[in-house]
């Protein structure tokens, strides 16, 4: 029998943490954020991961955001919206902004530039607009 190890604070900080998943409209995939933390740097980072509900390996969808999170599928399933603090076109977000990305990957596109940042957004049923 394997020797039991105590759970320490250092071990807890090393664990990656999954954020709330969002299920694709057809139910075949889910997307969630996966966060990691560095006690040494006192910094956190997160990326979006795509998971098949039919089995198979999860794959990263985003790589370069500071805090990619709160993913939501569009009603048609052709886009995933999320909030993030990123650097794009030589400009770094001061506050979390709204981005969209296709589920098959590519570069995420900033939807707007909101001085106070974006939280708590929702797709409208037409899949063309997002309210926040």
Regions found by a protein language model. Name each.
Residues 1-16, 53, 58:
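A short helix->beta-strand "capping" segment at the edge of beta-propeller domains
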Residues 27-30, 77-81, 130-131:
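Hydrophobic beta-strand positions that form the internal "hydrophobic ladder"
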Residues 123-131:
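Structured, non-catalytic alpha/beta "coupling" segments that mediate domain-domain communication
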């Amino acid at each position: 029998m394997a020797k039991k190890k105590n759970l320490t604070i250092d071990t807890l900080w090393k664990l990656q943490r999954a954020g709330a998943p969002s299920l694709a409209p057809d139910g075949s995939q889910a997307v969630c954020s996966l966060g990691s933390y560095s006690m040494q740097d006192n910094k956190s980072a997160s990326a979006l991961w795509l998971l098949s509900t039919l089995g198979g390996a999860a794959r990263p969808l985003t790589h370069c955001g500071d805090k990619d999170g709160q993913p939501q599928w569009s009603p048609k399933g052709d886009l995933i919206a999320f909030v993030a603090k990123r650097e794009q076109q030589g400009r770094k977000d001061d506050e979390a902004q709204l981005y969209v990305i296709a589920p098959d990957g590519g570069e995420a596109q900033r939807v707007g530039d909101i001085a106070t940042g974006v939280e708590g957004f929702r797709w409208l049923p037409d899949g063309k607009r997002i309210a926040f």
